[in-house]
Swiss-Prot record:
Location within or outside the cell: Cytoplasm
Quaternary structure and partners: Homodimer.
Residues covered by region (C): 548-621
Gene source species: Exiguobacterium sibiricum (strain DSM 17290 / CCUG 55495 / CIP 109462 / JCM 13490 / 255-15)
Protein name, per record: Chaperone protein HtpG
Gene: htpG
Matching HAMAP family: HSP90
GO CC, alphabetical: cytoplasm
Length: 621
């Protein structure tokens, strides 16, 4: 027996690798299974170039054997095994990758590839085991070897007897600690769960013993029978031919992966073989998850490296405006042990993400074009996120999303795209008009919209907080600027202008003095037809934006620049004129009342509701 030290490594390095790369101890099993799969792939590679070797895939498998009494977990494979030199080279040096070295010598010949990085992944076993024993017999040799280590202090190698080619790894599971239950890695149900989670699509069968109850022949009684059962699915759906798959196959996969309790509206199956190779199945859900619009929600797709799950939610694969998309990505070009930090700078991952965004956009555009009813169902659930995509990152993605958003049309009484709105605009209409408020019913009654509607121009109703912010970031659509119906200048040429007498001009000035600090101006309205009063705004901040900004935490004192407009054809206006001429105190009361009525119509708070109520009652007596 030879006792050796690890080459150029220390306890600190081993601990640093374990804690920095692996945050969940359960992934040790994923690493060992991946290495076992690699070992069988190596025989496959040899069979491709050596006609004397026959590769019968059915003869290759991985076996998992937990033993609670001895606290041992054994993983057996029928792979290529390791020589003594390979044991020292691959297991004696942390971060040395036998698989990567083999891969460099054997470039992919027909699609098979090597997953693991043996020197890194193997050492994850020490997260759950205090002793690791490896017994291996290399392909084409009669000699077997035993490698054993208790950790960073070193390892021993000796010759042993082993009948079959392959490798047996025995983990001596640690005793439980106060904050760590290692017993779970000896529980068959827990091991199956880990296998299904991380290694379900390894191409070789992963077998475990399972006890079944079977009827005893010639009797009503049953007996317990132990049988070997394959735990993993082996062939992932994303590697199957799309033509062989049905909608039901995709729905079943959606349910199996627990992407949601609903049925997806659409699936997207991608098989890319260009600058970067990857397969992906994406789903557009019908309904958001319960936490989708909460701060706890995490976006991301499952990320696999050649069939092995390396990240449950890779956020870098999805832009925020498509964060509702569920699904997975599997790439042969990604490393199994790539860290989150490295992923953020990975060129291949960025190419995949860019391609995925393009595919999602194309499919949503097709859904909008070909199945409007289904798209609107989707939009009711996720339209807010699409509009957020216009606003987010200073509008960097606005061109990606602008043709996917819908708004309620006042004229059509239905949702329309911006393109549909512009296409229906009369020739003399200069702007895309919109109105912001809590509901379409409330906006239908908005006093400021009377002139725009009289001209036969459509109005888009903005009923979500994000709408106006998104449109301001968009600036225009197809060269047409957006304009609120509350804007002081609607950009509408009128044959009849509101004529103001000298006395009325003086009265407006007096009203402005009464409302000093509250409004910028008081003037005659050109937009009001049946209502007595309304607010117009001047500048970028609308009244709805003011309400939203003031409701935010740590809000700044942001307010819309308000203009009080009066309908000079209304009876109320004549009452104000009379009061101005005959009763100045009443005139001031009327002025404040008009201002407060305008506040109420906009849903803004009145500074003193009690005084307002008393004032209304006083005027009734």
């Amino acid at each position: 027996m030879e006792t050796k030290q690890f080459k150029a490594e220390s306890k600190r390095l081993l601990e640093m690798m374990i804690h920095s790369i692996y945050t969940h101890k359960e992934i040790f099993l994923r690493e060992l299974i991946s290495n076992a799969s690699d070992a069988m792939d190596k025989i496959y590679y040899k069979a491709l170039t050596d006609e004397t070797i026959t590769f019968d895939k059915d003869a290759y498998k991985i076996t998992i054997e937990p033993n609670k009494e001895t606290r041992q977990l054994i993983l057996r494979d029928t792979g290529i095994g390791m020589t003594k030199d390979e044991l020292e080279e691959n297991l004696g040096t942390i971060a040395k990758s036998g698989s990567l070295a083999f891969k460099a010598e054997n470039e992919s010949k027909d699609g098979h590839d090597i997953i693991g990085q043996f020197g890194v992944g193997f050492y994850s076993a020490f997260m759950v085991a205090d002793t690791v024993t490896v017994v291996t017999k290399p392909f084409g040799s009669d000699v077997a070897y035993k490698w054993e280590s208790h950790g960073v202090d070193g390892y021993t190698i000796e010759e042993v007897e082993k009948e079959m080619v392959g490798t047996d790894i025995t983990l001596h599971i640690k005793a439980n600690e106060e904050d760590e239950n290692y017993d779970e890695y000896l529980e068959p149900y827990r091991l199956r769960s880990i296998i299904k989670k991380y290694s379900d699509f390894i191409r070789y069968p992963i077998e475990m013993e399972e006890t079944e109850q079977r009827p005893v022949e010639g009797s009503d009684e049953t007996e317990s029978v132990t049988v070997m059962k394959t735990v993993n699915s082996m062939v992932p759906i994303w590697r199957k031919n799309k033509r062989e798959l049905t909608d039901e196959d995709y729905r079943n996969f959606y349910q199996e992966k627990r992407y949601g309790f609903d049925a997806p509206i659409k699936h997207i199956h991608i098989s890319a073989d260009g600058a970067v190779r990857y397969q992906s199945i994406l789903f557009i859900p019908e309904q958001p998850s319960f936490d989708y619009y909460s701060k706890e929600f995490e976006k991301g797709l499952e990320l696999y490296a050649n069939g092995v799950l390396i990240m449950e939610k890779c956020s870098d694969l999805l832009p925020d405006h498509f964060s509702f998309v569920k699904g997975m990505v599997d790439s042969e070009d990604l490393s199994l042990n790539i860290s989150r930090e490295m992923l953020q700078h990975d060129r291949q991952l960025k190419l995949i993400a860019k391609n995925i965004q393009s595919k999602i956009k194309t499919q949503l555009e097709a859904l909008l074009r070909d199945d409007r009813e289904k798209y609107e169902t989707f939009y009711q659930a996720f339209g807010r996120q699409l509009k957020f995509g216009i606003y987010n990152d200073y509008g960097m993605q606005k061109d990606t999303v602008k043709d996917l958003v819908l708004f309620h049309s006042a004229k059509e009484k239905k949702l329309v795209t911006l393109a549909e709105y512009v296409a229906a605009m009369p020739e003399e209409q200069k702007y895309i008009y919109y109105a912001s408020g809590e509901s379409t019913d409330r906006l239908d009654k908005l006093p400021q919209s009377e002139l725009v509607k009289d001209k036969g121009f459509d109005i888009l109703y903005f009923t979500e907080e994000i709408d106006e912010f998104a449109i301001q970031m968009l600036l225009n659509y197809d060269g047409k600027e957006f304009k609120s119906v509350t804007s002081s200048d609607l950009g509408i040429e009128q044959t009849e202008q509101a004529e103001t007498t000298e006395t009325q001009a003086e009265m407006f000035k007096a009203m402005q003095e009464v409302l000093a600090g509250h409004v910028k101006e008081v003037k005659a309205s050109t937009r009001l037809k049946s209502h007595p009063v309304c607010f117009a705004t001047d500048g970028a901040v609308s009244i709805e934006m003011e309400k939203i900004l003031k409701a935010m935490p740590n809000n700044q004192d942001v307010a819309a620049v308000k203009i009080l407009e009066l309908n000079t054809s209304h009876d109320v206006f004549r009452a104000i004129e009379t009061a101005y001429a005959e009763d100045r105190p009443k005139f001031e009361r009327y002025t404040k009342l008009m201002y407060q009525q305008a506040l109420l119509m906009e849903g803004l708070p009145i500074e003193d509701p009690v005084a307002f109520a008393n004032e209304v009652c006083a005027l009734m007596i």
